[in-house]
Every structure is written in C-alpha cells, then in structure tokens.
Amino acid sequence: MAGSSAATSCARFLALLATCLLWNEAASFTASGWNKAFATFYGGSDASGTMGGACGYGDLYSTGYGTNTAALSTVLFNDGASCGQCYRIMCDYQADRRFCISGTSVTITATNLCPPNYALPNDAGGWCNPPRQHFDMAEPAWLKIGVYVGGIVPVMYQRVPCAKQGGVRFTINGRDYFELVLVSNVGGVGSIQSVSIKGSRTGWMAMSRNWGVNWQSNAYLDGQSLSFKVTSSDGQTLTFLDVAPAGWTFGQTFSTSQQFS
C-alpha cells in the first residue's frame, strides 16, 4: 500500500511538473539563436517613406513603432504572418570591416514586405528574392549598425521578445457587415496566429486575416460592445472583454491593459 501510494504521489508530481514546464514554455517567448542575412535601408533620413506598408500599421509614429522598423524579404515575411515580430540585428563586422559599425545592435519590428525583383540577380539588386533572408531597414535604424555609403551590409540577427508600453490595441475600420480590425502594439512574440470577435448579442466568431495584421469579420455588429480573443503565434491566448463600447464608430482605436509576455 505504501509503495502504491508513493508511486501515485510521484506520478502526480511529475504530471504537475510537466504541466508547469509546458505553461512556462507557452507563457513567455524567448530569444532565438543567431542567423545570417543582409540588410539595406529605405524611407529617407526621417523614415517618412516607411509609413503604411504591407503589415497595415499605417502611421508608424502614431501607432508606436517609430523608426526602428524593417521590411522583410519574401521568405521572412511569410505572407504577413511575421508582421509585428521583433529582431535584434547587428552588422557582421568580421565579414565587412569597412561598412559595419562594430559593437552595436538595433532591435526592429517587422512592419512591411520587401518585394522580390526577379529582373535582377539575387546577389546584384534582387536582395529580397527567395530564398534570401534580407532586412530592408528604415534608414535611421540601419545607420545605427552600418555606414551610409555602404548601402548593403552582412548582418547577424535573432528573434527577440517585443517590449511594448501599455496593452494591445484594436483599431476598428470598415463598414456595416465588414469589420476590419487592426491589432497592434502586440508584445511577446509580436505576431498573431488567430483572432475571434464577439458582439454583446453574439457568440464568438473566428476572423480571417485580410492583409498584414488586419483581421476581417462579415458580421453585423453595429450597436454592440465588442470583445476579442487573440492567439499569438507561440500559442498564448488572451481574451479582451468589452474592448469597444456599444457606441463605437469606425475609425476608432481602443487600448487595453492586457499584454502578451
């Protein structure tokens, strides 16, 4: 009996330990290993040419992303699934001592696509062609790691957790029977796997990715308070209840106090 009881207690402990380990793995995104790529820059000295972009964040100043941003090559962009991810980038000084700034790094957020240019070779202008891993960085961010006249430099990069101030934000655009919701200021892993929406008179409804970080619903939700359920690309799910009051209008942005880790 004593042996059986001890075995049962041990099994329960191991099950609890496994649960805790799995929870910790899902609960906090950690930095990846280092990889090699190349980086160029665009958008001008004030990064005004980086506004908008294929992720749909719009004005990067007002949405909190600033000038530490980059457009990702086709492979890294992953049809928009990488929007919002954060990368620490440093120039590979050992590979290019002439144009690399040694001992510095910059953390950027993915906000745009660097489109392929199949008219040019991959190593002579077609920098963002598959299968290249490439960052076309906002000029102010690039100048923290590279010398302007270099134009293109070899880099080392790693995925890192996104550190954000405040909670996740929801901007509601569209029209009747077409809600287009921009989900921004996402911390932790930074990118989103799925979004669901719920009106005060409906159940939960899955949204579809329209483009970038804009998620679409075709329900009629006017006059209802809105709640959202967001799952990040590393499997964390947060529920944001009554984010928008019943009197919301298209074009409004609503901030929350909840954030991914």
From Swiss-Prot:
The keyword Signal applies. Residues 177-256 form the Expansin-like CBD domain. SMART domains: DPBB_1. Induction: By gibberellin (GA3) and wounding. It is a peripheral membrane protein. InterPro entries: Expan_Lol_pI, Expansin, Expansin/allergen_DPBB_dom, Expansin_CBD, Expansin_CBD_sf, RlpA-like_DPBB, RlpA-like_sf. It comes from the Eukaryota. Expressed in adventitious root primordia, coleoptiles, shoot apex, leaf primordia, panicles and flowers. Keywords: Cell wall, Cell wall biogenesis/degradation, Disulfide bond, Membrane, Secreted, Signal. Gene3D superfamilies: Expansin, cellulose-binding-like domain, RlpA-like domain. CDD domains: DPBB_EXPA_N (cd22274). GO terms for biological process: plant-type cell wall loosening. Disulfide bonds join C55-C83, C86-C162, C91-C100. PROSITE patterns: EXPANSIN_CBD, EXPANSIN_EG45. May cause loosening and extension of plant cell walls by disrupting non-covalent bonding between cellulose microfibrils and matrix glucans. No enzymatic activity has been found. May be required for rapid internodal elongation in deepwater rice during submergence. Belongs to the expansin family. Expansin A subfamily. This is Expansin-A1. It comes from Oryza sativa subsp. japonica (Rice).
